[in-house]
Amino acid sequence: MKPRVGFFDFTCCEGCQLQIADLEEEIIGLADIVDIVEFREVLTGSAASYDIALIEGSITRNSDEERVKDIRKRSKILVEFGACAHLGGVNKLKNLRDETAVRREVYGDAWNMPHLNTYPTRAVHEVVKVDAAIPGCPVNRREFITIVKALAMGLPPKLPDYPVCVECKKRDNVCLYDIGMACLGPVTRAGCDAICPTHKSACEGCRGLVPDPNKNSMRDVLAKNGISLDEVFRMFTMYAIDPEVLP
C-alpha cells in the first residue's frame, strides 16, 4: 500500500504548493510512489490520517496552533515545507514591531476584529514535533521529489551541509561581493542551485543557515569588500535568521 500524503497550508502565499502543482508530468510519477489524499490546490478530497503530512506556512493564530497539533496527531511523519514553515519566513517580520501597531497599519479601523486575531509568528517546529524539513522560498522542486521519495521508502532525507557559495562555484558565477553586492551565500544552506546569485540577485537566506556556519570567513568577506554588518543584519531579518550568527 502506498504511503498517504497530505498537503496543508497555514500563513503563507502558497507558492511552495504551486511549485509542486507545476511539476505536471513529474507529479504523476510521484503518484506512482505515494497516494496524494489531500492537496487543496489540486484536488477536493481529504483524509482522516496521513503517513506524510507536508505543512506550508507559519503559525500565527491560536486556530493555526490547534489545527497543526491536530494534523500532527493524525500523521506518522510531519514535514515543514518552505521557508514560512521552516523558519517563520517573512511573516516573522511582524515580530520585530509592536503587534497592535502592525495590525492597525495593515487593517486600519478593522484592526481589532476578532477574526483578525493573531500572535507572534512561529515556525512549525516551534509548535509541534517535526520529522523533516524542505527549506526554500519557494522550495526546490527536485529536492522536494527527492525528499518525499526518501520518506516514502523509509529513508532519512538529506539536505546539503555546505553553503550556497559552493553551488556558485560549480556554476562559475562571479561572486556578488566582487561586484559590490552583499550576499548571505557564505552562511546559507545550499540546495537551490544558487538560483538567486546566478541571476545577479543576492542570496537572502531563505533556506536557513548551513550547519556550523563559518562566521570568521563571512566577517572577513564583509571587511574585505567594505560592507557593514548593519547592512547584512537587515538581510538576515527577511527570513527570520538570527543575526547573532555574526556577533
Features from the language model and the residues they span:
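Short gly/pro/ser/thr-enriched loop/turn and capping motifs at secondary-structure boundaries
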Residues: C84-G89
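Portal/gating segments that form or line small-molecule/metal binding sites
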Residues: K94
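Iron-sulfur (Fe-S) cluster-binding modules
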Residues: M1-L54, I59, S63-L78, D98-P247
